Amino acid sequence: MKVTQHIENAKGETLFSFEIIPPQKGKSIQELYDNIDPLMEFKPPFIDVTTSREEFIYVNKGNGLLEKKLTRMRPGTLGICASIKHKYNVDTVPHVLCGGFTKEETEYLLVDCHYLDIDNVMALRGDAMKDEQSFVPTKGGNKYASDLVSQIYQLNQDRKSTRLNS
């Protein structure tokens, strides 16, 4: 169900939802469930799941040299969304970023949302990378959240409930 439908169906009643951050690589999803379980008593109609921008890390190559490598420290947004939707029977809202994604990668993510029956996304420009003074869009990606919303709309013909935040 779309977030807008949840709000309409509430008929003025207060709704509680929350936003979660995917665990770091190597952590168990069970830790995430352990944090979500006590919050389910509030009956959230939907749960937002953030997407972390990629970042540079330095990896020791073993010969005293460091290699600069681009990585995501908290991957798995869509997998977590699908898992929460299945385990708790609650709608999920993955964050979709301009930063770190080409338009083609965004399209693939939206196709995955469709296959997973995820009807909502939150479109965000995203933050600048840690070593950038200001936001620099990914080559071949969207510069503004409004551009991202336009892409989502065009690809899905308004199938998704898109919340805009820049």
Task: State what each model feature region is.
Residues M1-F18:
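N-terminal amphipathic alpha-helix/helix-capping segment at the start of soluble metabolic enzymes
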Residues E8-K11, I36-K43, G79-N89, L110-I118:
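Acidic (Asp/Glu)-rich catalytic clusters
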Residues P23, F42-T77, M129-G140:
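Glycine-rich, proline-tolerant flexible connector loops at the mouths of alpha/beta enzymes
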Residues K160-S166:
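Conserved small/polar residues in nucleotide/adenosyl-binding loops
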